[in-house]
Amino acid sequence: MAKVKEKVAVVTGASSGIGEAIAKKLSQQGASIVLVGRNEQRLNEIAQQLNTPAKVVSADVTVKSNIDDMLKAVIDHFGHIDIVVNSAGQSLSSKITDYNVEQWDTMIDVNIKGTLHVLQATLPYLLKQSSGHIINLASVSGFEPTKTNAVYGATKAAIHAITQSLEKELARTGVKVTSISPGMVDTPMTEGTDFGERKKLEAQNIADAVVYALTQPSHVNVNEVTIRPV
């Protein structure tokens, strides 16, 4: 079984919600953590709570130069990377007939382009060392959109497609890639959302799924994990 201990994990969107939970879980498993996000103060607070070495990098995933600079800082500090978790995301309820183009642009920039920026920066290092694991946070909305999340669902469908294609590209390179697709998760991003009678997941449930994917034997790749409340 693969181990997380002593690995270096880059986690985007680490200042709250799912990203924060993943960062803390990986630290509990013994990984050194790179906390990436825009809220530097909050990232520093989280870093103080970790039991393993941590580096805070204030960066916006939608700005390619920010991510390039982040990777240089990480390599200078730790010397290598092993795990990349793309958990930065934006979820805004918006019907097509709301015509809220600015919200659409934000979700496309963060959810799709942000993920691609991180991939283009980190993949060369992972491929050079012939090892590593990329975790992309998708969503059940990517294949079960509702009438109020068409664009969000489309961005997460894109993450499914990117992950599935990348898995084929990376075959026999030693680098694995997994997409995690949660149902509704109780996080600051969904605060104010009316869950109705629907049950919801906790961010910790997603963090547990990430560890499951990362700790499979070397010959096993978990391509897709779908998590729903019961």
Curated annotation (Swiss-Prot):
It comes from the Bacteria. GO terms for molecular function: oxidoreductase activity. Substrate binds at residue 139. NADP(+) binds at residues 10-34. SMART domains: PKS_KR (SM00822). It holds the Pfam family adh_short. The active site is at 152 (proton acceptor). Its EC number is 1.-.-.-. Keywords: Oxidoreductase. SUPFAM superfamilies: NAD(P)-binding Rossmann-fold domains. Belongs to the short-chain dehydrogenases/reductases (SDR) family. This is Uncharacterized oxidoreductase SERP2049. It comes from Staphylococcus epidermidis (strain ATCC 35984 / DSM 28319 / BCRC 17069 / CCUG 31568 / BM 3577 / RP62A). The lineage of its organism: Bacteria, Bacillati, Bacillota, Bacilli, Bacillales.
